[in-house]
Amino acid sequence: LINLEGALTEEGYAVHKDNSFRGPTSYVNILTQNSVEAVTLANDHSMDYGQKGYDSTKAVLDTAKIPYVERDSSTVITTKNGLKVGVYGAVYYKMDVDQISADIRKLSKEADIVVFAPHWGYENSAQCNSDQEKIARAAIDAGADIVYGCHPHVLQAMEEYKSGVIWYSL
């Protein structure tokens, strides 16, 4: 599972922001050659090249048969060696702890392992914040096995909580 922080496209125009990220569509081969089993697009850069860039990214992933979580909160289930892994991705501006808990409870009924992949926290902060802790623990309480956080661009704490593992930022 990776957080695809940008678009795979030759289309679209960069949005007006400090950093806009994209790679050519051929970069999907890097993912397939390195056994990437799923991708989350639930981040602040998946729309860097507008709707055309986002649609191109999804089409390239579809062609490569790499399942993905959409940019706003959504889920995907992928099967590897008979094991169903459910991934739930969410972006900080769409995080409602009650909705996340309900979605994870539902996903845990369909998957053997549930990974919650939030895009959250403060950039360049090595400390997780109280909202991250609250949401991560609620996700585990609801049935997630792993919390795989991204966004701060630095490592944050790892915590074993009840029967789950939380990486606040990798």
Model regions: which residues?
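Acidic, metal/ion-coordinating pockets
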Residues: 1-170
